[in-house]
Structures are given as C-alpha cells and as structure tokens.
Amino acid sequence: MTYKRVGSKRLAFCLSYFMLTAVSADVVTEDDLLADMHLVSSVTHMNQTLDKTPAAVTIIDRRTIQASAAVDVLDLFRLVPGFRAYYVNANFPGVTYHALGDDNPRRLEVKIDGRSVYESIFSSVEWTTLGIELDDIDYIEVVRGGNAPADGSNAFLASINIVTRSPLQEAGWKIHSQIGNDNIRNNAISYSGQLGAVQHRTVLRHSSNDGFEDFAGNYAGQFTQIALDDGADTTTFGFRGLWTPSAKDSIELQFGFNDSEVGIGDINYILRQIDYQYQHLNWSRINSDGSTFEFTSYHNKFDLSDQKDALTFYQALNFFPEGPLKESLAQLPDKLIIEPSHKAISERWDSEFRATFDHRHNVRAAYGAALRRDKVKSNMLFDMSDSSAENSSRVFAHFEWQMSDKLIANTGFLSESKDGGLPVGSYRMAVNYQLANNHTLRLGFNHGYRAPTLLESNQSTFVRYDENLILDGVVVSDSDIHAEKLISSELGYTGSLFNDQLHLDMRLFSEKMSDVIAERREQYPDFDGQLNIRDNTDSVTARGLEWQAQYRPSSQFLIHANYSFVDLTHSAFYRSTPVEQIRDLSGVNPKHLGSLLVNYVTNRELSLSAMLSHQSKIRHFSGNDDEGFTRLDVKAAKSWQLAGKDAEVALTIQNLGSDYRENYFYNQFSTRYVLSLKIGLL
C-alpha cells in the first residue's frame, strides 16, 4: 500500500528556497578534494592511514558506490564483512554486526557527517528518516568491532559514519528520477551554489513505494494469504552550507526535515507517521603547528504517530478466560482503553569539543568532552503523560605512539556518566607491526560498556482500565538494570599488492558480551498471567574470521569481495517464574555472509556491474527457520555529457532469480527492476 501525504507548506518553502538560491558557482574537481581519501578518523578522532588504526575499518568510497548495484543506502552494507542488512518490513530495515539483529537493532552507532542519528525513543536507528540517497554520499567509514572508546555506548558492536558530498564538489542544478516495479517512484532535485560567502548544497526529495507484494503460498503445511500494507511515502529537505572565514577556520551548518508515512507491523499493519528534523553546526580550526580544534553541536527531533485500531474495555474482555474475574470486570462500565493514535516524541541535544596535537616525541593525541540531553515522551511506553529526560556527559582521550619505524601503539579510553548513575569506562589498546612495506599486522584488545538507554531503563508499558486497575502488563524495566559489557580481542592484517592495485584486510576475532539487555518473562496478575521484564538476561560469544579485498587494476575495472564466518553462542534467560527457563539462541545469526562485486566501465562510458550476496541459514528457536539466500543484482549505466553537464541513465535489476525470504516468511523479496535518470542542468 502507498500512503500519500506531503506537507504543502514545507514543500512550498523548499521550492521557494531553491529559486532564491540559484546562483552560479565554480567547480572544484573531485580529485582535488579526495587526496586524503584513505585517511580515516572514526576510530581515534585523529586522521590515520588504514595500517595505523587500532581497529578494522572498511571504506566504501565514491567509486565503489557508483560501481555497486545498490538502490538504497542499506544495500551498501552488504559490501562490509560481518554486516547483515535485512528488512523487518519493506520500509523498516535493520543493520547489525555479528549478532543481536532484532526488529530494533540498538548496538550500532550510525552518524551522518558526525551527527548521531540514533534515536532514544526506540533505542535504534530509523533508517527511513535519514533523508539521504546514494548520490548524496561521498564515502562511508565503517569501524568493524566495538568502538565505544571513541563513540560511546551506541557503538557497542561497531560504528558507521556516512560522509555526504561537499558543496564544493558540484555546481548548478541536478535532477534524479527513479521508477520501478512495486510502484517505486523516487524523485530528487538538488542545487549546489553560493549564498554570499557560503557554499551550499540543497536537496529536495520525494520517494514512495508499495512495499512487498502480498503473500500467497504454503506456510506450515497450509495455504496462507496475507495482505502486506507496508508501503511508504516520504518527503525530505536538506541543506548543507560551508563557510571559511579564514585560512584556519571552517564553519558548517546543516539542517533538514523528513515527513514519512510508513506501513509497519507483524501481519497486522499500522500506519506510522513520522516528522523528523535536525540542525547541525560544526566549527573546526587547523593551527599552524598541525594541532586542531573542533566544536560540534546538533539537535534531532523525532515525532511519530502510530495509527491503529481502537480497543474498548468490553472488546478487551473477549480475550479474558471465562470465570469469576471476567464476570466481576463485566460489571464495570465500558470505555476506550487503547486510543486509535499513539504519539511519541524523542529529542536529543549534543555538544562536543575535540582537540588534537601532532608529533610531540613521536606521540599524537586526540582528547575531548561532550554533553548530551535526551528527552522522550510516550504515554504508551512510559505509562505517564509527562516527558522523561536524561542528561549525560563523556570525556575521552586517544594516543598514537610511533615506537619505531615498524611499530605503532594506540590506546584510548572514554568515560560516560548519566543522571544518578556511576560512570562507565571503555578502553582499547592495539599494536600495529609493519612486516614489510604495505603489510601490517595488528593485535588489539577492547573493553567496552553499553549503558542502558532511556527506554531500556525506564520502560513501563501497561494496558489500564484506570489508574488503579491494570488489565495487561506488557513490559517494565528492572530497577537494577545495568550496563552491558564487551571484552574482545583481534588479530588483523592490512596490506596491498601489485602497486596498490589490490587491497586486503583480514580479521580474526573473539567477542564476549555479558549482561546483554533483553526481556525475561515472569508471572503477573493480569489476564494472561505474564509480564516481560527488561533486564540483563543474555550472554553472547562470537568467534570467527572475516576478510575483504578490493582490486582496481585500472580506473575502468573494480572487483570487491568480502566474507565472514561467525561462530555464535547465545544464551538467553527467557523465563524467571514460575520455573526458570534458559533458551539457546545461537542459531539466530547467520554463520556465513559474503558478497562479490564486479564492475567494468567501457571506453564509451558504459558501466556494467554484477553484485552477488550470500547469507546462510538462520535457525529460530520457534522452528520457523530462514533458509538463507544467494542474490544476484546487476546494473548497466550509461554516462554522457549534455550541454556540458553530466547525465546518466541506468537500469538496475535486484535479485535476478527466484524470490527469497526477508526476516519473516511473508516478506518475499521478488525480482526488482529500477530505471533511473540523472541530468545536470545549467
């Protein structure tokens, strides 16, 4: 189903803004800007080459993005070893690393230009609200492994920083349109130019699709039909401005909004309306001695409304078993107990100061401090009409010591404090040894913590008749809930061969997670006799191997391959009363993940791509196993010059073969055809 709702006032503002800012600007070539493309900063907040970082890093650069057969951002993470990208619903995706991939994966930090998009209300990332497409991305830094010493609790398993294209990299107008089956309709218009001394890039985008096709087929031995109302309709506006008042200083301002309507649910679907907005300010200075200062501050606001079927008290009584309790409750007057609309608001304010110094006695360092305030409001999730807020702070420091020409040591720590709680500290140590030119071994140790989120530590979800009568207890947080713990070690290798044409990355890892937050069941005096308690219930151990390789013998040819093997042991404390029950969930993560991308660009600017992705079987405790899949995506794209501007037409075919299952049996990913057109205008 496709939902149609466009904010006319916002749309009018955006169109007016485009017309007012249409001025010419000089073009700076991409080669001028990407000289330091292989420098990464997400691991230590210092620019480092890949052979000096204390953790494994994957860079998805512009060339790889263009070569891929990806249609949206989610597809790109199939190119990263150990990363699993999946769909809970057609427009409700999830991404996780190695383990713990549920409907709301919440142990992965995701940033856009350094601004966290991790939302407090569901303790996860709402990918629908990101408001970016492949054309907006310059490159992506992915830290594979716990990155809490750099990014805090959200980066418990890994972290992602999506870096968008600078306003200096384009000039003038550009339109992009996509059409495809499942009623895919995506249209965008962007403008890069100058407002006084400010270089800017501004984008207006509208996207819609009908989601997965309705399910009709055999399930559990019988013919089943399910209507999937999981379409989406989204309008996005984004502005990025860059001002350089001096040779030392640069100031960047970003703001935008996203209006979405998305169908979500487990067989029974509801309509979720999302209004999302953000503001992001960054100031940086490069001093003459090579040291730097940086200050960044941002605000995210996530406002949602779930439209669902209302429920009256007498309707709820139909779910109660016959007996004296039901007869007694039937004497009470009828009333509405579940509203047809559930509203929730999540806000985050975050400010961080960061500084670096270089090469003092062969030591470089980065250090900083930050303040954060999270505020949420949801009567359904917190059983109160007032807002719930949490203040937190963090301090960090990272050091790189060049011990010799061949040996580098890295160490770093971060301490987080929240209202009324003890501080938790995460640290990492690593040594990198250069075996030979372009061949480096890395030995690393990581000790990280993930503090409970605002939802995890304060959830209280009940269905009430009134203040004194609870009909159903759903979820409540345990009063003694505390931080999750990760202890990991790794042996890594980075290297290059054939004059830097072939780049290799391998990682052997052991990751032990304890006090993992999930839900246990206990007896409760309500209609079903059960209450879910959010508590430290699970323990997870992951051991395995992952590698990636990219071969670029020329500017026309690219091969990218990756593979991961994860041996997972997952124990869950499922029920505490009346009898304790432990469940083995070791099969809920695929043991094998991998992908292969091959791209060739002819002399006539015809780009041909094939992308193969594989995921092995997932074994669910219920026995409803996901058999895994091997999926082939192909793309052909033709580029040319039109009146001195770039133009491109492309056809992408995803899953060239039989349908496969995405997460639930009724989510069948069929062959998808997407035709796109990009045109640069004067």
Feature names for model-found ranges:
Residues 73-76, 93-98, 108-113, 127-130, ...:
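N-terminal periplasmic accessory domains that precede
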Residues 116-144:
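Short acidic/polar hinge/loop motifs at secondary-structure boundaries
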Residues 37, 42, 49, 57, ...:
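Extracytoplasmic beta-strand/coil segments of soluble accessory domains associated
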Residues 209-213, 230-234, 248-332, 336-347, ...:
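Flexible loop and strand-edge segments within Gram-negative outer membrane beta-barrel domains
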Residues 294-308, 374, 434, 442, ...:
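Membrane-embedded beta-barrel scaffold of Gram-negative outer-membrane proteins
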Residues 148, 161, 168-171, 176-178, ...:
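Periplasmic-side early beta-strands and strand-to-turn transitions of outer-membrane beta-barrels
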Residues 216, 514, 519, 614-619, ...:
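C-terminal beta-signal and adjacent terminal beta-strands/loops
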Residues 366, 402-408, 421, 509-512, ...:
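Gram-negative outer-membrane beta-barrel transporters
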